[in-house]
Every structure is written in structure tokens, then in C-alpha cells.
Amino acid sequence: RRMGKTGLIFHLFNQPEVKDHYHTVFVDVYASSSLTEFVYFLGKAILEQVKKDKHGFIDHFFQVIKSLKVGFTVDPVTGETSFDLGLGSIQSPEITLDEIFHYLESMDKPCVVAIDEFQQVGFYQEQHVEALLRSKIQQCKKTVFIFSGSKRHLMYNMFNSPAKPFYQSAVSMGLEAIPLDKYMPFVQSLFEERGKSVSPSVIEKVYRKFDGTTWYMQLMMNELFTSTGYGECCTEAQLDAALSGIIQVQDGGHRMLLSQLSYKQKQVLQAIAKEGKAYGITSAEFVGRHRLTSASSVQSAVRVLLKKDILTQQDDCYWIYDYFFGEWLKRNF
């Protein structure tokens, strides 16, 4: 997460080749836990897009999607009517889903629908949602889909496991970090636009510190930019103060998060924070080095921390998802 996949999708949507020839819809289903909620988020995203159009698509929307129970309100000052969807608007999710797909296919231009955090579908209460969506999408002639997600291993499993409905139904692409040789001139140009400069070594240190993860680098570079005056050059001497400033602002949130964890979960988290990138976390060496209780207690703690998105994992490597939280732990414990 926070590598920039959502920004990349919106960047794609803003390209003339896409913007001029397609209708685009972006829907984030991270907060969904059922088919009803999926249909709600999808319908709401399409409705919001339809509201922006001035070509009578709103009438067409309600003509095709008849099963929605939409709320209407009248502004007492302007007299204008507005409408919105609520979760209660979805009475028959499968019927509404059928109508939504019919609506997308009936548009005057092809549609591109981007579904973010698509891996959540695999955790729905209903067991058949992946198969249902696959069958609907397979029938589309004019609508194309982008599936994005922050849990790489879950996304990979959804599209590359022969047992899964979406097996080989899309081309997979991992979003890697922007290369340093591309990122460095970009940062330098932004400083120069405002009459400032930045040492290449500063950019490289920030890049290495956050493994090229876009969101964290941008926050850190913004802090450094703010602390650099007009006509000045940002140097390595400013790095620690910038990082400390960010961590200090987030101190309350970090303490709150830590207070919600059990003692054993805190122990494991602090051990991984000290390592930065931790390997072999259930090995006798790791357990002994950090004075943890046992391999099984580490395993159960990690299971919870992964589920809460506090830890992230790639193969046998574990690290704290929020780099600033990890730095805060190292400094305070």
C-alpha cells in the first residue's frame, strides 16, 4: 500500500486517450464485507460519475437501474433537488448488480471500471461472490475492468490459482517503486520551481529509508521542502529534524494503536521494529535474541498483526507497514 496505485489509475483516467473515448469509474471496496456493500459502493461510484455528466445519463441511470431505492432531498434555499444512495437502497443485491452491468454495457461509450482493494471480495460473508462477478464480467463486451489491491499475495492467489474463478482472467502487473534515477530529477525540479535546491544525497537517503515507497517519501520531502528557505539548499543536516517532526505529530495515534494490542503482540512488534526487516521470526535464534515466549506465541501474534495491517509480509520477510510507526517504536522502546 501507499506505493501510488490509486494515483496511477487516476493519472490513466486523465489521459486524453482514455478521457475522450471512455467513461471512467473508480470504486474503493476496502470497507466492504458483503455483496450488498459491494453493490452499494459500485452503484454509488457510478451515480457520482453520472452526476457530473450533462448529457441526460442520469435519466438513463434510473431507467435501467430500477431496483435502487434512492433518497431525494430538496434544498430549502435554492429549491434544487439532490439524491443519494444509502446502504438501505440495496434491497436485492444480485438484481441490482445485473442492472448495473446492463447499464455499463448500454452507455454511449465504452466504460473503464477500476475496483480498488479487490482482494476484499475474498472475505465476503457470501461464498459465491467471486464466481458471480466473474460470470458478469465475462459477458461484458464494452466494459473493461482494472482490479487493484494492496495485498499482493491475496491478489496473486485470486488471479493465478486454478481453483479461483478469476484464474488467468486478467494480466497481472506488480507496481514496483519508482526508480531512483527517475525520482531524483523529479524532486529536484520541484525544489527549483520555488527557488530552492536539494542535495542528491538527501533524496537518496530518503529513498533508501522508505524503500522507494511513494507516500512516505512524499511526506518526508514535503517536510524537508518546508524547512528549506528560498535560495537555500536542503542538506543531510535537516533529515533527522524532519523525521522527528513527522513522528512527533503522529505520537498520539501511535500510542493509541499500541494500547489496543496485547502484551505478546507488542513484544513481537517491537522485535520486528528493531530488525527493520525481520526474517525467520519463528526460529529459535529470533525468539531467543528478542526474549520472546515461544515460536507458537510469535506465530499467533503475527497472525493478528497481519490481519490488522500493522505488519506486512513478503515471503519470509516481515516489516512494519507504517514506516513512521516503525521508526517511532525504535526510538521509544
Region roles according to the model:
Residues M3, G7-V112, S296:
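P-loop NTPase nucleotide-binding core
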Residues T6, T213, D322:
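Short, conserved phosphate/pyrophosphate- and ester-handling motifs at nucleotide-, phospho-/glycolipid
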Residues Q15, L132, E223, V304:
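Alpha-helical DNA-recognition elements
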Residues F83-K151, N160:
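Conserved Walker B catalytic segment
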Residues R152-A170:
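Short regulatory helix/loop adjacent to the ATP-binding pocket of P-loop NTPases
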Residues V171-K182:
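Conserved AAA+ ATPase "SRH/arginine-finger" region at the nucleotide-binding site
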Residues M184, Q188-G252, Y263, D315:
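Amphipathic alpha-helical "lid/sensor" segments that cap RecA-like P-loop NTPase cores
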Residues Q248, G252-F333:
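C-terminal leucine-rich, beta-strand-based interaction scaffolds used for sensing/assembly
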